[in-house]
Amino acid sequence: AARDLLLFYIAFEGMLVPLYFLVGRYGHGDAARRRHAAIKFVLYSLAGGLVMLFGVIGVYVYGPGATGAADAFHLDRLTADGALDAGNMGFFLMLTFLIAFAIKAPMVPVHTWLPSTAKVARGGTSTLLVGVLDKVGTWGMIVICWPIFPHESAKVAPVIIVLALVSILWGALAA
């Protein structure tokens, strides 16, 4: 598992490149539908990634990076008591990560990229989308949001639980 937030962010965004081609070029159906699904997937993911980039920069500014620490992005350093002194910005920073992870998860209401993408993706690509990519969003919520922003995460946990349940039920009923 990536224990460095910057490395995680790079890999988080790097996943888009092969999946774009797997969906857009090698999916099934007509080329226009494949291209539309691939572009929709990339735009959603890039929007989430851009929001998360603001969070990564904020973690650097308000965290150990402000003191010039070499390991400013290491999760163990970020989760140490008092490592992130963001004050009122802590909630905003946590939301930046949460939005990006909710898009990847895909959680209602930012899940609309998945049906069109899964519809044109081949079996192996769908396995990557559902078996790997979706889990990265959930993993990020648990391993990054909760430890770095424990107080802020506790405040939004009931909302996340409701959205997760709605996502599960919506997915089951729409399938």
Show where each model-derived region lies.
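Short phosphate-coordinating micro-motif centered on Lys-Gly-acidic
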Residues: E13
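Hydrophobic transmembrane alpha-helices and their helix-loop junctions in integral membrane proteins
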Residues: A1-F8, P18-A175
